[in-house]
Amino acid sequence: MQIRYLGHSAFEITDGKWNLLIDPFITGNPACPVKAEELHPQYILVTHLHDDHVGDTVAIAKRTGATVITSFEGGQALAAQGVKVADMALGGKRRFDFGLVRVTLAFHGFGPTGGHACGFVIHIGGKRIYHAGDTALFSDMKLLNGVIEEPGIDVAMLPIGDNYTMGPEDAAVAVEWIRPKVVIPMHWGTFPVLVQDASGFAARVRETGASQPVVLRPGETYTL
């Protein structure tokens, strides 16, 4: 299984059969190395409707026929634009043909429709991948460490950009709580206000021994 970082909070997950996109902010993303037309997902997961997360969702979904997994409010807004939607809500789980999705809490605004921002735990290919979305640090993250997700998270994507989300210090605390096998920092460096030292974050995580940090540059891939 491969996880390709597309810059900001956008990721592509492929396992040889399924192709998933998360928060596909492609067009207008100065860090993204690909064009939206190059992506061919079967599913798109959207954590909230801020432009830097919903991004090219509608255009990609219309072109490929992908199903968009998002919140109820976001689903209504996207369905009105002719997109096929599977809407969910905080705390919910749902099985899809590729695996299972759990919708997790995220402390952040949602966008023009209102509703709740979220994160996702994606079960695919025998792995559990947590994309936190845009969020502050919150103590319920501890539940992902073997409580509601047993035996725990294989890969966590956590924002470290600060200002709009938690910064590297709080993200390092999140890693200690979640204790994923691998952590990939996201939502950093895209714009001047998000400039951070990802290598410093990685060093902090290594010191704690809570996870293996993997800092991906846009376009790079991590293989599970």
Curated annotation (Swiss-Prot):
SMART domains: Lactamase_B. SUPFAM superfamilies: Metallo-hydrolase/oxidoreductase. One of its GO terms (molecular function) is hydrolase activity. The keyword Hydrolase applies. Gene3D superfamilies: Ribonuclease Z/Hydroxyacylglutathione hydrolase-like. Keywords: Hydrolase. Pfam families: Lactamase_B_3. InterPro entries: Metallo-B-lactamas, RibonucZ/Hydroxyglut_hydro, UPF0173, UPF0173_UPF0282_UlaG_hydrolase. PANTHER family: UPF0173 METAL-DEPENDENT HYDROLASE MJ1163, UPF0173 METAL-DEPENDENT HYDROLASE MJ1163-RELATED. Belongs to the UPF0173 family. This is UPF0173 metal-dependent hydrolase STH3160. It comes from Symbiobacterium thermophilum (strain DSM 24528 / JCM 14929 / IAM 14863 / T). The lineage of its organism: Bacteria, Bacillati, Bacillota, Clostridia, Eubacteriales.
